[in-house]
Protein backbone atom coordinates (compact mmCIF):
# COMPACT_ATOMS: atom_id res chain seq x y z
CA UNK A 1 0.00 0.00 0.00
CA UNK A 2 1.38 3.38 -1.02
CA UNK A 3 1.43 5.94 1.76
CA UNK A 4 2.09 9.24 0.02
CA UNK A 5 2.45 12.05 2.55
CA UNK A 6 1.80 9.69 5.46
CA UNK A 7 4.56 9.10 7.99
CA UNK A 8 3.67 5.94 9.86
CA UNK A 9 6.40 6.63 12.42
CA UNK A 10 4.94 10.06 13.23
CA UNK A 11 1.43 8.64 13.49
CA UNK A 12 2.62 5.83 15.77
CA UNK A 13 4.25 8.41 18.04
CA UNK A 14 1.02 10.44 18.12
CA UNK A 15 -0.99 7.31 18.89
CA UNK A 16 1.27 6.26 21.75
CA UNK A 17 1.21 9.78 23.17
CA UNK A 18 -2.58 10.26 23.08
CA UNK A 19 -3.80 6.67 23.36
CA UNK A 20 -5.93 7.00 20.23
CA UNK A 21 -5.54 8.21 16.66
CA UNK A 22 -7.67 9.33 13.73
CA UNK A 23 -6.58 8.16 10.27
CA UNK A 24 -7.96 9.69 7.07
CA UNK A 25 -9.62 7.37 4.57
CA UNK A 26 -7.30 8.76 1.88
CA UNK A 27 -4.57 6.37 3.02
CA UNK A 28 -6.73 3.41 1.93
CA UNK A 29 -8.22 4.92 -1.24
CA UNK A 30 -5.17 6.23 -3.08
CA UNK A 31 -5.57 3.70 -5.89
CA UNK A 32 -8.59 4.13 -8.19
CA UNK A 33 -9.42 0.42 -8.12
CA UNK A 34 -9.87 0.58 -4.34
CA UNK A 35 -13.16 2.43 -4.76
CA UNK A 36 -14.76 -0.50 -6.58
CA UNK A 37 -13.20 -2.93 -4.10
CA UNK A 38 -14.76 -0.87 -1.30
CA UNK A 39 -18.18 -1.19 -2.92
CA UNK A 40 -17.75 -4.97 -3.10
CA UNK A 41 -16.80 -5.09 0.59
CA UNK A 42 -19.76 -2.90 1.56
CA UNK A 43 -22.23 -5.20 -0.21
CA UNK A 44 -21.12 -8.11 1.97
CA UNK A 45 -22.64 -6.43 5.05
CA UNK A 46 -26.14 -6.96 3.65
CA UNK A 47 -25.60 -10.72 4.05
CA UNK A 48 -24.56 -10.67 7.72
CA UNK A 49 -26.72 -12.72 10.08
CA UNK A 50 -28.14 -11.27 13.28
CA UNK A 51 -25.91 -11.14 16.34
CA UNK A 52 -27.22 -13.72 18.81
CA UNK A 53 -25.79 -11.69 21.70
CA UNK A 54 -27.40 -8.34 21.00
CA UNK A 55 -30.49 -6.89 19.36
CA UNK A 56 -30.37 -4.68 16.28
CA UNK A 57 -26.91 -5.90 15.29
CA UNK A 58 -25.60 -8.29 12.64
CA UNK A 59 -22.11 -9.71 12.90
CA UNK A 60 -19.44 -12.07 11.59
CA UNK A 61 -15.99 -12.80 12.97
CA UNK A 62 -12.84 -14.54 11.78
CA UNK A 63 -9.32 -14.51 13.06
CA UNK A 64 -5.82 -15.05 11.79
CA UNK A 65 -2.87 -16.46 13.73
CA UNK A 66 0.53 -14.89 13.14
CA UNK A 67 3.29 -16.99 14.63
CA UNK A 68 6.50 -15.34 15.77
CA UNK A 69 8.70 -17.32 13.40
CA UNK A 70 6.55 -16.76 10.30
CA UNK A 71 5.59 -13.72 8.19
CA UNK A 72 2.34 -15.41 7.15
CA UNK A 73 -1.19 -15.03 8.48
CA UNK A 74 -2.97 -18.35 9.01
CA UNK A 75 -6.77 -18.35 9.04
CA UNK A 76 -7.82 -20.05 12.28
CA UNK A 77 -10.43 -22.80 12.30
CA UNK A 78 -11.81 -21.39 15.54
CA UNK A 79 -13.75 -18.16 15.60
CA UNK A 80 -14.41 -18.14 19.35
CA UNK A 81 -14.26 -14.65 20.81
CA UNK A 82 -13.69 -13.98 24.51
CA UNK A 83 -13.61 -10.75 26.47
CA UNK A 84 -13.11 -10.54 30.21
CA UNK A 85 -15.70 -9.01 32.54
CA UNK A 86 -13.11 -6.40 33.40
CA UNK A 87 -13.29 -4.93 29.90
CA UNK A 88 -16.80 -5.82 28.75
CA UNK A 89 -19.33 -5.61 31.55
CA UNK A 90 -22.18 -6.58 29.18
CA UNK A 91 -20.90 -9.66 27.33
CA UNK A 92 -17.58 -10.36 29.04
CA UNK A 93 -16.73 -13.57 30.84
CA UNK A 94 -18.17 -15.87 28.20
CA UNK A 95 -17.04 -17.27 24.88
CA UNK A 96 -19.08 -15.84 22.03
CA UNK A 97 -19.30 -17.65 18.72
CA UNK A 98 -20.16 -15.85 15.50
CA UNK A 99 -20.54 -16.88 11.90
CA UNK A 100 -17.28 -16.77 9.97
CA UNK A 101 -16.59 -13.94 7.55
CA UNK A 102 -17.16 -14.81 3.89
CA UNK A 103 -14.09 -15.79 1.88
CA UNK A 104 -14.96 -13.14 -0.72
CA UNK A 105 -14.58 -10.45 1.94
CA UNK A 106 -11.37 -11.88 3.39
CA UNK A 107 -9.87 -12.23 -0.11
CA UNK A 108 -10.83 -8.72 -1.18
CA UNK A 109 -7.48 -7.02 -1.97
CA UNK A 110 -8.59 -3.82 -0.24
CA UNK A 111 -9.42 -5.67 2.97
CA UNK A 112 -6.12 -7.55 2.78
CA UNK A 113 -4.28 -4.23 2.38
CA UNK A 114 -6.11 -2.79 5.37
CA UNK A 115 -5.11 -5.76 7.53
CA UNK A 116 -1.49 -5.44 6.36
CA UNK A 117 -1.49 -1.71 7.12
CA UNK A 118 -2.98 -2.27 10.57
CA UNK A 119 -0.45 -5.00 11.30
CA UNK A 120 2.51 -2.89 10.21
CA UNK A 121 1.23 0.01 12.32
CA UNK A 122 0.65 -2.17 15.38
CA UNK A 123 4.10 -3.74 15.06
CA UNK A 124 5.78 -0.33 14.98
CA UNK A 125 4.33 0.56 18.36
CA UNK A 126 5.96 -0.29 21.66
CA UNK A 127 2.68 -1.87 22.75
CA UNK A 128 2.68 -5.18 20.88
CA UNK A 129 4.97 -7.89 22.28
CA UNK A 130 6.60 -9.24 19.12
CA UNK A 131 7.95 -12.29 20.97
CA UNK A 132 4.44 -13.75 21.26
CA UNK A 133 2.14 -15.41 18.73
CA UNK A 134 -0.63 -13.02 17.73
CA UNK A 135 -4.33 -13.27 17.04
CA UNK A 136 -5.50 -10.78 14.43
CA UNK A 137 -9.28 -10.63 14.78
CA UNK A 138 -11.62 -9.27 12.11
CA UNK A 139 -15.10 -8.25 13.23
CA UNK A 140 -17.74 -7.27 10.68
CA UNK A 141 -20.56 -5.47 12.48
CA UNK A 142 -23.72 -3.83 11.17
CA UNK A 143 -25.70 -1.71 13.62
CA UNK A 144 -29.36 -1.56 12.51
CA UNK A 145 -31.77 1.04 13.85
CA UNK A 146 -35.42 1.86 13.30
CA UNK A 147 -37.48 4.73 14.62
CA UNK A 148 -38.68 2.59 17.52
CA UNK A 149 -35.55 0.49 18.13
CA UNK A 150 -32.08 2.04 18.43
CA UNK A 151 -28.95 -0.07 18.10
CA UNK A 152 -26.39 -0.29 20.90
CA UNK A 153 -22.75 -1.27 20.93
CA UNK A 154 -21.34 -3.77 23.45
CA UNK A 155 -20.46 -2.59 26.02
CA UNK A 156 -22.80 0.35 25.76
CA UNK A 157 -20.70 2.92 27.66
CA UNK A 158 -17.12 3.97 28.35
CA UNK A 159 -14.70 1.05 28.47
CA UNK A 160 -11.26 -0.16 27.51
CA UNK A 161 -10.69 -3.11 25.21
CA UNK A 162 -9.13 -6.44 26.17
CA UNK A 163 -6.91 -6.13 23.11
CA UNK A 164 -3.91 -3.79 23.41
CA UNK A 165 -4.48 -2.31 19.92
CA UNK A 166 -7.81 -2.01 18.07
CA UNK A 167 -8.55 -0.44 14.68
CA UNK A 168 -12.08 0.74 13.91
CA UNK A 169 -12.72 1.24 10.19
CA UNK A 170 -16.04 2.77 9.17
CA UNK A 171 -17.25 0.81 6.14
CA UNK A 172 -20.61 2.44 5.46
CA UNK A 173 -23.17 4.76 7.05
CA UNK A 174 -26.70 5.42 5.84
CA UNK A 175 -27.59 9.08 5.46
CA UNK A 176 -30.63 8.61 7.68
CA UNK A 177 -28.57 7.48 10.67
CA UNK A 178 -28.38 9.54 13.86
CA UNK A 179 -25.67 8.88 16.45
CA UNK A 180 -23.05 6.18 16.23
CA UNK A 181 -20.44 8.70 17.33
CA UNK A 182 -17.25 7.92 19.21
CA UNK A 183 -16.47 9.29 22.67
CA UNK A 184 -12.92 9.38 24.05
CA UNK A 185 -12.27 9.78 27.77
CA UNK A 186 -9.27 9.86 30.08
CA UNK A 187 -11.47 8.47 32.86
CA UNK A 188 -15.04 7.15 33.13
CA UNK A 189 -16.12 10.54 34.47
CA UNK A 190 -14.34 12.77 31.96
CA UNK A 191 -15.26 12.80 28.26
CA UNK A 192 -12.48 14.59 26.41
CA UNK A 193 -13.27 14.11 22.73
CA UNK A 194 -16.24 13.55 20.42
CA UNK A 195 -15.45 12.07 17.00
CA UNK A 196 -17.91 11.42 14.17
CA UNK A 197 -16.78 9.07 11.42
CA UNK A 198 -18.87 9.88 8.35
CA UNK A 199 -17.01 8.68 5.24
CA UNK A 200 -16.15 5.05 4.42
CA UNK A 201 -12.72 3.93 5.68
CA UNK A 202 -12.28 6.82 8.08
CA UNK A 203 -10.48 5.08 10.90
CA UNK A 204 -9.84 5.26 14.63
CA UNK A 205 -7.11 3.41 16.51
CA UNK A 206 -7.49 2.70 20.23
CA UNK A 207 -5.01 1.56 22.85
CA UNK A 208 -5.63 0.83 26.51
CA UNK A 209 -4.59 4.31 27.60
CA UNK A 210 -8.06 5.80 27.09
CA UNK A 211 -11.68 4.86 27.62
CA UNK A 212 -14.02 4.99 24.64
CA UNK A 213 -17.64 4.38 23.73
CA UNK A 214 -20.04 4.56 20.80
CA UNK A 215 -23.32 6.44 21.16
CA UNK A 216 -26.51 4.53 20.23
CA UNK A 217 -27.55 4.55 16.58
CA UNK A 218 -31.04 5.80 15.77
CA UNK A 219 -33.11 7.29 12.97
CA UNK A 220 -36.13 9.53 12.49
CA UNK A 221 -37.09 7.83 9.22
CA UNK A 222 -39.52 4.99 8.65
CA UNK A 223 -36.82 2.92 6.93
CA UNK A 224 -33.96 1.15 8.70
CA UNK A 225 -30.69 3.01 9.19
CA UNK A 226 -27.35 1.25 9.45
CA UNK A 227 -23.73 1.76 10.42
CA UNK A 228 -21.18 -0.78 9.19
CA UNK A 229 -17.74 -1.16 10.72
CA UNK A 230 -14.73 -3.42 10.46
CA UNK A 231 -12.78 -3.93 13.69
CA UNK A 232 -9.25 -5.28 13.41
CA UNK A 233 -7.96 -6.36 16.82
CA UNK A 234 -4.54 -7.50 18.00
CA UNK A 235 -4.17 -9.84 20.96
CA UNK A 236 -2.02 -12.78 22.01
CA UNK A 237 -2.65 -16.40 21.17
CA UNK A 238 -3.98 -18.44 24.05
CA UNK A 239 -1.45 -20.72 25.70
CA UNK A 240 -2.57 -24.25 26.54
Swiss-Prot record:
Gene Ontology terms for molecular function: dioxygenase activity; ferrous iron binding; L-ascorbic acid binding
Assigned keywords, A-Z: Dioxygenase, Iron, Metal-binding, Oxidoreductase, Vitamin C
Q: Which residues cross the membrane?
A: none
Which cofactors does this protein require?
A: L-ascorbate; Fe(2+)
- Coiled-coil region list: none
Mention any Pfam family matching this sequence. Answer: 2OG-Fe_Oxy_2
Q: Does the keyword Metal-binding apply?
A: yes
Q: Does the keyword Metal-binding apply?
A: yes
* Leading EC class: oxidoreductase
Q: How is it used?
A: 4-Hydroxyisoleucine is a natural nonproteinogenic amino acid that exhibits insulinotropic biological activity and increases glucose-induced release of insulin.
Q: What is its EC number?
A: 1.14.11.45
Q: Which family does it belong to?
A: Belongs to the iron/ascorbate-dependent oxidoreductase family.
Q: What is this protein called?
A: L-isoleucine-4-hydroxylase
Gene of origin? Answer: ido
Amino acid sequence: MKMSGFSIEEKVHEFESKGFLEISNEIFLQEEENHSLLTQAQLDYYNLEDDAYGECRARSYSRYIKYVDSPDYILDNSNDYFQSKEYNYDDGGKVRQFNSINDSFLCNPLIQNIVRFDTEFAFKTNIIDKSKDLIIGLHQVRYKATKERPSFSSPIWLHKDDEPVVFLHLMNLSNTAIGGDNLIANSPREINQFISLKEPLETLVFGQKVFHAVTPLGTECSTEAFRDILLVTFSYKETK
